[in-house]
Amino acid sequence: METEPEKGMHSGKTAFLFDLDGTLVDSVYQHVLAWREALEAGGIHLAVWRIHRQIGMSGGLFVNALLRETGHTVSAEEAERLQRLHAEAYGRYVSQVRPLPGAADLLAYLTAARVPWAVATSGRIESAGLSLRLLGIKEDVPIITRDLVRHAKPDPDLFLAAAERLGVEISDSVVVGDSIWDLLAARRARALGVGLLSGGYGREELERAGAYRVYNDPADLLRHLDEVGVRSAE
C-alpha cells in the first residue's frame, strides 16, 4: 500500500536519479537470457553468470567485455546486430517482467513529496519502453536512455543528462542503482550513490563501487528515505 508523505515533508534540492532494470523492475535475468540468445545466434557461447556480471553497462561495452572473455572479435556491424537480436529476444521475455516490490510506491511517494526524480538507463528506448509501461510512469517524467547520450554507464553521461533535465545540480542528486556500473557512473558524476540488492550484485561489491547505503529493494529504500536526504522538516 502506498505510504503518504509526512506533513511538512520537504526535499530541499535533493533529486533522485534511478536506474531501471534491477532497480525499479525485476528484469535483469530476462536481459541475461535475452543476451544469451543473441550471443548464441552469433556463435558465441557463454555461461549465464558471466553475462550477468556485465548487465548494466552500455550494449556496446557489454558486447566488447564479453567478447574479450571469449577471445572473439566482431565488427561494429556485428556488434550492432547482436544488440538488435538482444532487443528482439527481450521482447519475448518481457511478459515475465514485473515491477520490483515498492517501486511504484516509492515513485508515488517522491512525487507527492515534490522530490524531483528521473530514470536513466543504459538500455535503448525499444527495450526500456516496455519496462517503463509496467511502472505507469507519466510522460512528463524525464527518461534518459542510451539513445540520448554519447556514452552510457559506467560513464556518467546518463546521470548528468538526467540531472540537467530536472534542473538540479548533480552534486545534489542521489543515484539509485543495482549494479557496480551504476555506482561507478554515480561516483564519476560526483553524485551520492545508493545501491539495491535487487539486481543480483552483493552488498560488498556495491559498497566497493561507491554505494553510500545499500538496501534490499525499492520498498526497503522507501522505509529509509531519511537516511538519504528526504526527511521531515524540523
Model-found features: residue ranges?
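Helix-loop "lid/cap" segments that line or gate small-molecule binding pockets
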Residues: 38, 58-74, 131, 162-163
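Surface-exposed amphipathic alpha-helices with a cationic face
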Residues: 104-111, 183-188
